[in-house]
Amino acid sequence: VVPKLQNYDGLIWGGSSLNIYNDTPEIRRQISFMKECFKNVKKILAICWGMQVAVTAAGGEVKKGAKGSHIGIANDIELTNEGLNNQLYKDKSNKFNTPAFNFDEVVTTPAGAIHLASNKINKIQGLNFKSGVSEIWGLQYHPEITYTKMVDIIKFRKDTLIKKRNRFKDEQEVNNHINFIQEEIKISKKDFRMLELRNWLNIIN
């Protein structure tokens, strides 16, 4: 795969249920592969786990979220001044809600990184930095996933979220949260949710 990386205009690295600080062999392989991408791919969009891998590979650090997690939705993400002027956020509102599912967060950014977005749970929701030949845009949230899919994931992981993750006390609390997300579905617009993807594709064209 590595010799062919230079054939691509860009790379999107998506999500995972792994925790990067667990430092397992499969995680180390992913970090190593990201470093190879930094040598060969000029434009990278790193989403959720992808951002955590990219940040770690570039010398930053990821830890368990100190202020909690996002289960299906991230509320009130706000763009920084740099975010407002970054091409990734062209036509985006300065504050928005978006699909998200994460328990970990970036706590130390790579050298020279530009902070693009944050909310009350995670300071780093959006990031732009360079490593090797690559320019990387990192998002902690998921513009590529619908809220409906997030609801399906919550239902699938319900027992884990209650018993292992301790994010909900019981099934009723899970259902209340799902109802909250379903209200967001009523007002969410696909084109707005996916603006970051559109803008990134325009960047690499």
Where are these regions (language model features)?
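Active-site-proximal flexible loops/turns
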Residues: 2, 21-22, 55, 109, ...
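Short amphipathic alpha-helix with an adjacent loop that forms part of the alpha/beta core around
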Residues: 1-8
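Cysteine-nucleophile active-site neighborhood
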Residues: 18-83
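Structural motif
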Residues: 12-14
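Amide-donor transfer/coupling interface in amidating biosynthetic enzymes
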Residues: 79-205
